[in-house]
């Protein structure tokens, strides 16, 4: 189910401590659901808004993971984006907000729905420029190379690339 681009990114970053050889929701007691210092730069502040808090969580936007097996790059210095989730990176001032409100930002972002005449938040973090490169073409499309916008209609924009090829990008809600 694709609700919005932020939810799509969260689906890609979801981590569970369950599975074969893993824990269950019942065995995840309070002390096991806490954020450990060793999670910094790997596991984000985002959590499920249910009994799965701490059992199902999310990676940070730029986790210090060095391979597909999940090995941690202990020798790498983390990035600023790697400290929080995608929603944390999008929410202006999240580091200065109440922790409960900051955590709820993730849940709230998953429920956002596009509509006509909405006004985007005027306070930005710059991370919104990264989102287009991380989501599927359902939400955004990155140009294939240098080119020029040659036509804009109500439904799409047309780009003519330097090599002469033409591509059409849909606009708005479909």
Predicted features and spans:
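Long, charge-dense accessory insertions within large macromolecular proteins
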Residues: 1-174
């Amino acid at each position: 189910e694709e609700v919005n681009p932020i939810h799509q990114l969260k689906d890609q970053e979801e981590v569970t401590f369950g599975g074969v050889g893993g824990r269950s929701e019942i065995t995840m007691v309070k002390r096991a659901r806490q954020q450990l210092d060793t999670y910094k730069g790997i596991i984000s502040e985002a959590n499920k808004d249910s009994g799965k808090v701490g059992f199902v969580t999310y990676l940070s936007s730029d986790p210090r993971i060095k391979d597909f097996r999940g090995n941690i790059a202990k020798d790498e210095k983390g990035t600023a984006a790697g400290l929080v989730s995608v929603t944390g990176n999008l929410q202006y001032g999240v580091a200065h907000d109440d922790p409960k409100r900051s955590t709820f930002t993730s849940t709230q972002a998953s429920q956002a729905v596009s509509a006509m005449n909405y006004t985007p938040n005027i306070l930005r973090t710059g991370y919104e420029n990264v989102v287009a490169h991380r989501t599927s073409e359902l939400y955004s499309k990155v140009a294939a190379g240098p080119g020029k916008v040659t036509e804009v209609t109500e439904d799409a924009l047309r780009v003519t690339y330097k090599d002469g090829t033409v591509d059409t990008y849909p606009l708005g809600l479909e």
